[in-house]
Amino acid sequence: MAGLLLAMMFTISNLTPAYAHQPINLTATNSSADKGPIIVDGKVSFVIRANFSKPNQTQGFRAALQAGETLYFEYLIIDKAPENKLAKNKLPVATITDPAGKKMVIKFTERTKFYYPFLDTNFVYLARYNQTALDGIYKFTLQSKVKAAIQVVVGTLETYGEVLSPATCPAWVKPSGEVKILPAYAEGLVGMKKEAAASCAEKLGWQYRIGQEDNQMFALTRDYRLDRIND
């Protein structure tokens, strides 16, 4: 009987998900999507927390998806004051910009309460959205109307996911076989000084092309050939 009980306990414990949403805490330094962290695989589930101390503050992040994958987004608040007392037009505005540059403002379509046991916390869903993704980097911008704290979720895959710091040379290990530089890694160089980004690309063994340049800001295209550098 003891052996059977232990077996039952083991089975039940294995039914519990191995991962909850992985957290990302945005700060004032993440004042735009281009200055925010980059989720390498947008299918992986992350909860992104934004805390605003006054109106008209902006925080943002990015996530990479491949064509045909699903962009999944949730907007939540903790079920307590002041957030659960705010009118919809006083809550932070969430805007998603797709790789083609099309912007979409998330509309609040529900007010569904639920209990999240991992944090022993009650939340309220205000929006849940999904669509078939384009290939490239999605940018998420959150802008406050008043002092408020919110959480948004991207992705549904409950497994470990990688997050890159903005404008930072990534810790990239060259894989065996044909090398494909993921868009998220190239995106990580956006915002770096030209010389620093070129040095990073050289250190990692990348070939690159500057697609545009604005003072010290520029973006990389998918053409990484060294003989295709434009000034």
Where are these regions (language model features)?
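Exposed, flexible binding/inhibitory loops of compact, secreted disulfide-stabilized domains
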Residues: 177-230
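A residue-level signal for beta-strand positions that form part of recognition/binding surfaces
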Residues: 17, 137, 228
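N-terminal pre-first-transmembrane soluble regions of secretory-pathway and organelle membrane proteins
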Residues: 1-69
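Low-complexity, flexible helical/coil segments
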Residues: 108-112, 173-180
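Acidic, Ser/Thr/Pro-rich low-complexity intrinsically disordered segments
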Residues: 52-124, 131-135, 145
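Short, charged, low-hydrophobicity "junction" segments
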Residues: 41-52, 82, 178-186
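C-terminal edge strands of extracellular/lumenal beta-sandwich accessory domains
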Residues: 22-32, 61, 90-101, 129-177, ...
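Soluble periplasmic/extracytoplasmic beta-strand elements of cell-envelope proteins
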Residues: 72-74, 93-95, 141, 153, ...
